[in-house]
Amino acid sequence: MEMERINENTIRVVIGNDDLTERGITVLDLLGNHKQIEGFFYSILEEVDVDHQFQDNDAVTFQVLPNRNGLELFISKNTDEDDVADESQGDASVDSEHPDQVSDQIKEHLLEKDNQKDFFSGFKSAANESNDIEDYLNDSGQPTTTRVVKLHSFEDMISLARVLRLENAASNLYRYQDAYYLELVFFVNESSRESIKDELAVAYEYAERTKVAPDVLAEHGQLIMDNSALELTRFHFLGNS
């Protein structure tokens, strides 16, 4: 983790994926767990603000910039001048008292089209595939067969995404009861029985069979990635390799 004092009111913190792992957190966790967001931000603030110039300030804002290598976190003390700057920045910064805004901000940065064009060209490709898959799933005349596997950790999801490249299937990643589940929806008319069997064999190298049903995940689980979870994981964590 690297810290840079931009000025007397702003600290820039570069948080790598290794730093996130050490803290038992991922970018995906920051998309939905609001209490974890708040606790994580303040733990970082406590580490870098050794002089307590920011912790003692009642109005602290956090700006989050996710990237492939982790996060950049800008921590700012609010002053009258800051308020003027905030007006020109729109929603660039997030009030620490409203951590629920942070997950939306992270999603916006991950989906931004005009920022970091090379990075997001891969995301657009994944989004296009997701739209094609959604069209297929919405066609009631197209039969599907579904399997759910339980991942031992999110790192196993990354490892699986590296080797499993589905041609005619959807993949949905859920978090349920502190575990990750991958739902694989195969398009029967577009796949052979042998290809489905082979793809499941690859999945079982990194995950295990589970009795948790798709309906349970849909109703009680947290949907993290929809339709193209494997490709999105490759893009965000493997550089779309």
From Swiss-Prot:
Residues 80-89 have a biased composition (Acidic residues). GO terms for molecular function: protein-macromolecule adaptor activity. Residues 77-102 are annotated as: Disordered. InterPro entries: MecA_C_sf, Neg-reg_MecA. The N-terminal domain probably binds unfolded/aggregated proteins; the C-terminal domain interacts with ClpC. Belongs to the MecA family. Homodimer. Enables the recognition and targeting of unfolded and aggregated proteins to the ClpC protease or to other proteins involved in proteolysis. This is Adapter protein MecA. It comes from Levilactobacillus brevis (strain ATCC 367 / BCRC 12310 / CIP 105137 / JCM 1170 / LMG 11437 / NCIMB 947 / NCTC 947). The lineage of its organism: Bacteria, Bacillati, Bacillota, Bacilli, Lactobacillales.
